[in-house]
């Protein structure tokens, strides 16, 4: 999909407003590699700073969390899983011998809201742990799911693992026809 290019004024944005935005970003020391501004599905401003260009891949880090939640939304919409699916039902082979009451209550929705019930994040989970899903599920679920927020990268990775278990596809494979191709996004790799 190629977005049409138009002048800022044609979509109701003064060109000076775009220039003012760029001046403000510079004034505050915000380093931009590239930008694209759209309104009503039309690109009205776009730019790249050397050495970057539209083909330069970028590490997006936590943006993958947004992609993961988008994928879960597609999967729910397609009936492949439910927000009410419980972790104990999704990973019965990875559970502690006696799952806690809080773990038994934990659902996909709680992972999406970063409220699974952990009191602490598990540092570097998955980097050197071949059974990181079991490690996640064995970590104490101190709080009732949905009652305590904890920024939790491992929970997002678990959502990607749920997607893989339910669909047989990686996050990137699942999103390619649903999101990346329709948006014209080419070479993309999601680490989750």
Each language-model region and where it sits:
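Short, compositionally biased leader-like segments
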Residues: 1-14
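Catalytic-site signature segments of enzymes, centered on catalytic residues
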Residues: 54-55, 118-192
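A short, well-structured edge-of-sheet supersecondary motif
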Residues: 17, 21-52
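Extracellular/periplasmic catalytic domains that process cell-envelope and extracellular macromolecules
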Residues: 29, 102-105, 128-129, 142
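Active-site SXXK
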Residues: 41, 58-84, 111, 159-163
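Aromatic- and histidine-enriched alpha-helix N-cap/loop-to-helix transition segments
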Residues: 61-67, 103-106, 149-157
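Active-site helix/loop module of the DD-peptidase/beta-lactamase fold
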Residues: 59, 78-116, 138, 167-192
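Second-shell loop/turn segments in exported
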Residues: 6-9, 96-99, 145-146, 161
């Amino acid at each position: 999909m190629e977005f049409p290019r138009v002048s800022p004024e044609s979509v109701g944005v003064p060109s000076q407003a775009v220039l003012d935005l760029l001046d403000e970003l510079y004034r505050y020391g915000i380093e931009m590699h590239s930008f694209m501004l759209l309104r009503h599905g039309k690109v009205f401003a776009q730019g790249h700073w050397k050495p970057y260009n539209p083909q330069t891949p970028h590490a997006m880090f936590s943006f993958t969390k947004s992609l993961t939640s988008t994928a879960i939304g597609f999967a729910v919409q397609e009936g492949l899983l439910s927000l009410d699916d419980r972790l104990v039902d999704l990973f019965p082979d990875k559970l502690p011998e006696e799952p806690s009451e809080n773990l038994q209550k934990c659902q996909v929705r709680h992972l999406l809201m970063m409220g699974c019930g952990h009191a602490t994040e598990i540092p570097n989970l998955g980097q050197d742990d071949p059974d990181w899903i079991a490690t996640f599920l064995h970590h104490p679920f101190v709080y009732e799911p949905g009652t305590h927020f904890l920024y939790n990268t491992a929970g997002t990775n678990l959502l990607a693992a749920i997607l893989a278990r339910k669909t047989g596809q990686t996050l990137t494979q699942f999103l390619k026809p649903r999101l990346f191709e329709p948006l014209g996004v080419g070479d993309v790799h999601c680490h989750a």
